[in-house]
Amino acid sequence: MQRKKYYLIVPCVTINELDYGYSFPITKIGSDTGYGALFDAIVGVMDKDCRMPDSAEAGWVEYARSPAPLFDKRLFRKEFGYHYGSLVKTATSIIMMEHLPDDSYVFEMWSTDGMSKEVMTCPGGSPREEVVETLSNALKKSEGNRAARPKYY
């Protein structure tokens, strides 16, 4: 198996004055076509099922889109913000998920300015529940990082 990398942006979207967290994958690294995936995470807490069957990426819904710079907030707002109305607040954290040949997973949480990073790992051979829990914890940490930063761009 080859190593696979995925990038996710976790923004905060406001609809009717309620805050929701959504995970929007932007590109699969090394792909000129800019494949992405969409999975839901409300307020940074992932559903335990999270649409991830036997491997962490197999259950993601893939869709084709143009590659986009990860840290371009104006482009981010243009691409995703208007799908949810005009009350978009802020992009929050970027999460990189890497699936390694030994079946281990690495999750890196980047701040939106790209200046700081935290890493969480899940060893090869871990049960699916542990992989899901690790990603859930990464999303919760991302949500905590969001709360510490200014709301508006």
Regions found by a protein language model. Give the residues of each.
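Intrinsically disordered, low-complexity regulatory segments enriched in Ser/Thr/Pro
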Residues: Q2-G36, E98-E133, N137, K141-R146
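Short acidic DE-rich linear segments
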Residues: R149-Y153
